[in-house]
Regions:
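Glycine-rich phosphate-binding loops of nucleotide-dependent enzymes
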Residues: 1-221
Length: 221
């Protein structure tokens, strides 16, 4: 949908950031309407945001691990008493983070402990997606992942996302996007919003030729 159509608001309602006034949010057979963000995360959803949420002084690895707290035992007692388990969890987490990064940019795999601050925008976006993927979600929500990037960087990132999808058959990816060229290339099914309402749904070619969609984007049918 065009700017201001309600795409990000839709994501925020799904993930518990905004409360729904009416209707229900059902995920994997469970009603998660107005659930907390943590509950939604535990249910198997993960997301990225339009604006970067990375902590720039932290390393690539540390930023990715922020998304892994569902799997990690935490607390001083655990770290002090069960040091063997802590070491095992760290090694498993490191291997998982490295494997994810290698899907996007193999060169970053040997730089996991470098600060994120020195990375270009495309690599920061990659790290954000890796942080979402580290929890092994069933639903990945990407909110305008190509925002702020060049056409070349956008094409490269879309290749990465398609590779992630190909390697994770049980993973569903929903992308918020308003650039039709990106939508045409990467999507299997499109849902178009305008002023908070769904105006079209289906394959890209069907949606792109819809009179309401053309009016929403161009002002004319």
């Amino acid at each position: 949908g065009p700017n201001g159509s309600g795409k990000t608001t839709f994501f925020n309602v799904i993930t518990g950031i905004y409360r729904a006034d009416t209707g229900r949010v059902v995920f994997n057979g469970a009603d998660v309407t107005n659930a907390t963000g943590r509950a939604v995360y535990q249910a198997g959803m993960a997301r990225t945001f339009q604006r970067s949420r990375l902590s720039l002084p932290l390393s690539i690895f540390d930023n990715i691990m922020i998304g892994n707290h569902k799997r990690l035992n935490q607390g001083l007692w655990f770290n002090l008493v069960k040091r063997g388990d802590f070491k095992r969890q760290f090694e498993e987490s490191y291997a998982a983070a490295r494997a994810l990064v290698e899907v996007f940019e193999p060169g970053l795999a040997d730089r996991l402990f470098e600060p994120v601050a020195g990375l270009p925008m495309i690599d920061r976006r990659r790290i954000e997606i890796c942080r979402a993927l580290i929890s092994a979600p069933r639903l990945l929500l990407l909110d305008e992942p190509s925002a702020g990037m060049t056409h070349e960087e956008t094409a490269e990132l879309m290749n990465d996302i398609m590779l992630v999808r190909a390697r994770n058959k049980d993973l569903t990816i929903i992308i918020v996007e308003h650039e039709m060229s990106v939508i045409e290339r990467i999507t299997e099914r499109c849902v178009v919003l305008n002023f908070g309402r769904k105006i079209a749904e289906g394959p890209y070619r069907t949606v792109a030729s819809d009179a309401q969609v053309q009016e929403a984007y161009l002002g004319v049918a």
